[in-house]
Amino acid sequence: METWKTNLDETKKRYIDWWNHKGIILNMWEHFQEGVKPHADIPAPSPAKDLNQKWFDPQWRAEYLDWYVAHSSLKADILPVANTQLGPGSLAAILGGVFEGGEDTIWIHPDPDFNDEIVFNPEHPNWILHKELLKACKAKANGHYYVGMPDLMEGLDVLAALKGTDKVLLDTVMQPEVLEQQMQQINDIYFKVFDELYDIIREGDEMAFCYFSSWAPGKMSKLQSDISTMISEDDYRRFVQPFIREQCQKIDYTLYHLDGVGAMHHQIGRAHV
């Protein structure tokens, strides 16, 4: 790679230290552009015709992200990463959830035909969209920046997006054995999806993640369980912890996004997943 970030090697060293629990990373969630000298003469695309083009047109997004990264600050440990997110928890859309583009985000609504079967359809348009978006961005990047892994998410959060949060919470009581089986099915599909997307975006063994603009020398992912604010510690240990543990065992570099103080009671006193 010949990226637009002149101090990338230094940042990589700091990331490797950070993954080994040493030092800090001076980064930010997104990029800023005020006062930035462009890294390349990349023109902005024509404004999106509508929200569908803004989010779900791979070529338009690739052109926009190419312009965006070229005009963004890459100082300190800010990484050159194209944010390819298709909404938080887009694995749910791959499994049948319904996309809706908003002004500032992408919403994923439950599958109206969901019947408790977790099925991966390799011909599903939302899965094809993920791959086409990443391929378009990778071609446009031309080695100048990383193409970030979308925020697939996992486990109960994916099922809640696919089925509805209230129904998943009832399942912890009404059909816990079925729920456990669904968690394993989602995990199995997660690894298949993750590996295929990783092979599209990887730079050697390296990759970047779209959220947190984070980097690792191998496979990495951000893990979380937002719904955990609404379940007991026993349910967390049964329906969340085993499957996050499996992700940590199979993915080289992982970080846990503790989204809200309500989820902290699952972590206090537990140093290891």
PLM features: residue spans?
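A contiguous, low-structure linker/loop signature
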Residues: 81-116
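Active-site loop segments of alpha/beta catalytic cores
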Residues: 1-51, 62-63, 68, 72-84, ...
